Amino acid sequence: MALLKVAPSRLLSRALQLTSTLQNCTATSIAARRNFHFTVYGRKDTSAKVSDSISTQYPVVDHDFDAVVVGAGGAGLRAAFGLSEAGFNTACITKLFPTRSHTVAAQGGINAALGNMEDDDWRWHFYDTVKGSDWLGDQDAIHYMTEQAPASVIELENYGMPFSRTEQGKIYQRAFGGQSLKYGKGGQAHRCCCVADRTGHSLLHTLYGRSLRYDTSYFVEYFALDLLMENGECRGVIALCMEDGSIHRFRAKNTVIATGGYGRTYFSCTSAHTCTGDGTAMVTRAGLPCQDLEFVQFHPTGIYGAGCLITEGCRGEGGILINSEGERFMERYAPVAKDLASRDVVSRSMTIEMREGRGCGKDKDHVYLQLHHLPPSQLASRLPGISETAMIFAGVDVTKEPIPVLPTVHYNMGGIPTNYKGQVITHVNGEDRVVPGLYACGEAASASVHGANRLGANSLLDLVVFGRACALSIAEECKPGEALPSIKENAGEESVANLDKLRFANGSTRTSELRLNMQKTMQTHAAVFRTGSVLKEGCEKLSVINSAMDDLKTFDRGIVWNTDVVETLELQNLMLCALQTINSAEARKESRGAHAREDYKTRIDEYDYSKPIQGQQKKSFSEHWRKHTLSYVDSKGKVSLEYRPVIDATLNEDCASVPPAIRSY
């Protein structure tokens, strides 16, 4: 409380004094050894100005950069050092130290048609990804990603990523779900490059290490509040420094959002507690649309009772799912791919087994993942992390007994709509329009390469390909050092007012209580299987919960490391994502990919692709559902929906588009 009595100018003075002392100390201690490229406080020669134009209660600092990246996971780091490498004065804002980002938790691998295990072709990878998306993916973006995949993996290898190897010294590639050879006619593909079962950990640390070569200014433990938008253009970001409570406005010609997904809208998920849809919500508050948020991936194998991820790589190495009768039940649901069918197919199959009484345990509410038939040496070399995780969270020795698993929320296919260059788009009068100065990549974005369902090991690929694409696109559009667009003197005023409102919120409901209500509503009303009545009830419940945001109570009135307020800011972001997710799901009256409606069990395309389309009348755009959902939320929490067409054309003649067909494995 004593801090409240100190003038903001004095607080800022103290903070800058401490910063200067630490920087000088660091520079002195290591200058003799090497040039110092990294500091959590940003580059030493960065010009920053103190302002009181939007608040007299908080220190406000203005920064100018060519580009600012929000988020320092795989996508954010790749975008940030790509921009710095091209000569752009770049800031990277992150609420976590970079290596704490959720990319670190990815286990299975990264897809690329290297052909190290058998002949492969990136066009076959393209086909599998389009099919996996249930024909909701944009084929120009999928073309770009799969064609760039081999070069992206080789680039990572050159950066020092320690891939697992074959006996011949090549990058080891394992089987993964939904992957095939020869356009689905050549059997199972081995396309997933991995570092045992800790691929995300290696990827993130490799990219972070690479990023230290460049003079990117990192602002670590800064919470991005909102975009600075003027006249339909993005001109930067406003953020809160959590360490000292100061406000920072980053004016930039280009802004890249790489803030990850919003898995924490659900009660049980594999996501870190920091996956709160911050960038998605920032875009929503800016009046821009989000795309396809109803498509939430349930990973088939989360540890029962804990929700921790058990990688698909287990099944790629030969693991099998069994029910209470000891039956390898996936043989009934996917006779060809079996346990390596696409994730949405496996999750639904597991749920059906449990519903029909063939689940395991006394409550019949999970199934088993069996690994103990595999050689212990294989488990030790290929799945060491899983062996450890299963012992810690399930008390299971994988060499002797099966792991109890059930479907768990894992990934968000939807996000901020972009084109294949990473440029954020809106849809106006039937046409896609680029939002000047705004880019997005990674799980925060929807390019849309995943459509209605993501293939395993395409997410890490998405990060590096489109993180790099954002940097390349900005380099095509701009030059380093160009004049920056102006911002209004009071830009960000509403963000600071909201922060202050939450800091002194004195209602009757705790943030944690409201968050739990939201998460349990999403868990029960927008699950693996969905029905109209349950979704509608969920929409109504979430609307009530959102209204209760006005009755929040926070307890910490300070400005230094006020985690109470930060969690409440994250709840605001989660709520915007949850509202759009469940309303979009209620409106989509079909089953496609991860969106499975029990009252609308079939996919509704422009034609009935179960039979020849010759002689069929093509459905109008309003009559079918092979289209992207665009969702908006107004200041009162009301969701409105629009739709935009799926892009079926590829980038060029090197790759033919894949027409819709019945999806089976």
Curated annotation (Swiss-Prot):
Source organism per UniProt: Xenopus laevis (African clawed frog)
Pathway(s) of this molecule: Carbohydrate metabolism; tricarboxylic acid cycle; fumarate from succinate (eukaryal route): step 1/1
Positions of post-translational Tele-8alpha-FAD histidine modification: H102
Subcellular location(s) per record: Mitochondrion inner membrane
Its biological purpose: Flavoprotein (FP) subunit of succinate dehydrogenase (SDH) that is involved in complex II of the mitochondrial electron transport chain and is responsible for transferring electrons from succinate to ubiquinone (coenzyme Q). SDH also oxidizes malate to the non-canonical enol form of oxaloacetate, enol-oxaloacetate. Enol-oxaloacetate, which is a potent inhibitor of the succinate dehydrogenase activity, is further isomerized into keto-oxaloacetate.
Record field: catalytic activity: a ubiquinone + succinate = a ubiquinol + fumarate; (R)-malate + a quinone = enol-oxaloacetate + a quinol; (S)-malate + a quinone = enol-oxaloacetate + a quinol
Keywords: Electron transport, FAD, Flavoprotein, Membrane, Mitochondrion, Mitochondrion inner membrane, Oxidoreductase, Transit peptide, Transport, Tricarboxylic acid cycle
Enzyme type, top EC level: oxidoreductase
Main location: mitochondrion
Name this protein carries in UniProt: Succinate dehydrogenase [ubiquinone] flavoprotein subunit B, mitochondrial
PROSITE patterns found in the cross-reference section: FRD_SDH_FAD_BINDING
UniProt note on regulation of activity: Enol-oxaloacetate inhibits the succinate dehydrogenase activity.
Biological process, per Gene Ontology: mitochondrial electron transport, succinate to ubiquinone; tricarboxylic acid cycle
Active site: R343 (proton acceptor)
Positions with a binding annotation for FAD: A72, A75, T94, K95, S101, T103, G108, A224, D278, E443, S459, L460
Gene3D superfamilies (UniProt xref): FAD/NAD(P)-binding domain, Fumarate reductase/succinate dehydrogenase flavoprotein-like, C-terminal domain, succinate dehydrogenase protein domain, Succinate dehydrogenase/fumarate reductase flavoprotein, catalytic domain
Any one of the GO CC terms: respiratory chain complex II (succinate dehydrogenase)
MF terms (GO), sorted A to Z: electron transfer activity; flavin adenine dinucleotide binding; succinate dehydrogenase (quinone) activity
